[in-house]
Amino acid sequence: MLKKFLAKLGKGAAKVDLQFENRPYGINEVVQGEVILKGGQVDQQINKLAVKLMMTVSSKNGQSVSRQVDEIPLTGPFLISKQEERHIPFHYSIPSTLPLSRNFVSYYFDTHLDIEGGFDRTDIDHVIIAGSREIHSIFNAFSQLGFREKATSGKLDTYGQEFEFFPTQLFADQINELEIRFAYMGTGIKIWLEVDCRSNYGEIEAKREFVLSKELLENEDQLVDFLRDSIAETVQQPQLYGQPFSYHVQQPGHSGIGSGIGSMVGGLAVGILGAVLLDEIMDSFDMDEIFEDAEEAIDTDDDDSDFFGMDFDDFSGGDD
């Protein structure tokens, strides 16, 4: 009787442990593993066993919120005997429209063992969601062109996820910042490219969008050449590329996700968090950028020889 009473309080109760290979997982990739159940000091009735994928979005000011992305049911009701051990297979395919893990976007699996008449048991396991092989190829190509990802890259909005880069080599005297978005298309990867070009009259925003074919994505040298030529063409005549992006035209008022633009990376975020909550969290980034831009302008006026007018410690990215 005492053991049953203690088990209801959690002492000597059944335990749960999700195990899978600890590495980054690309979108559309399958996480495979198993859940190990170990019976406690007494027989216990289990109502269900399920694993939830949770997403946490944080802001610079420390505000954060976690929401359920998906739930993977593993069992219905069953009885686990005293000291019994069970191994239950687990697999989950990462959705293509999830935001990628970045400084302010993270994920974890919450394994939940629902014990009848007692304290439920949980197991938390963090997981990194990375880009697909094709997106890795694009990131690597930008890296070869001297672009480094900013610390605030990966911000979310009601369309999806935006990745921000700054130049360190080839285009350092022509570009302030480069921003990109991705979407999976049947023929390859669609990319939206916004280039903040330097000019004698201030900054000019140029917008380009094109589809990188599967064949191009498989050839690293050709991909680098294509992106280099596209960026060079853009900075030479930025005034020719002032039209709004197609997803702005197709989705007036930011009212929907995925209409006519394929599967934009990060597009699932607004459905998980809600547009209002997402906007509130991301507002802190917008204010930080306003102050950073003001500081950059002041520093540039004080010292024209210092191109960026900012501390590179504010950024993080790939290896130089």
State each model region's role:
Residues 1-99, 103, 108-263, 279-320:
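N-terminal leader-region detector that preferentially activates on the first domain or presequence
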Residues 263, 267, 271-278:
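Hydrophobic alpha-helical membrane-embedded or membrane-associated segments
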